[in-house]
């Protein structure tokens, strides 16, 4: 498992017009997870791994929940 900090999103928009991330806020919350949807869902306290979309690059995991930007996990070395 890899160590990440959770960064919260300030999201603007709506389902009809689409969403955009207005600001990214560090939470100071550290979690350990792998990149599987079920693990990320459990660590973030979300109820349905089928509503989650995960986009992974080398240092950041971007998470959408129910088609809306939710948060990102930034890798800590």
Tell what function each PLM region has.
Residues 24, 32-50:
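A short, charged, amphipathic alpha-helix used as a generic interaction element across diverse proteins
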Residues 1-26:
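Short aromatic-glycine-(Arg/Gly/Cys) micro-motifs in beta-strand/loop hairpins
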Residues 5-8, 33, 56, 68:
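Compositionally biased, low-structure terminal segments
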């Amino acid at each position: 498992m890899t160590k990440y900090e959770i960064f919260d999103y300030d999201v603007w928009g709506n389902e009809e017009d689409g969403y955009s991330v207005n600001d990214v806020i560090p939470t100071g919350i550290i979690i350990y997870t792998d990149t599987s949807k079920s693990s990320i869902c459990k660590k973030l306290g979300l109820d349905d791994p089928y509503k989650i979309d995960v986009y992974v690059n080398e240092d950041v995991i971007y998470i959408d929940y129910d088609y809306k930007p939710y948060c990102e996990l930034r890798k800590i070395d």
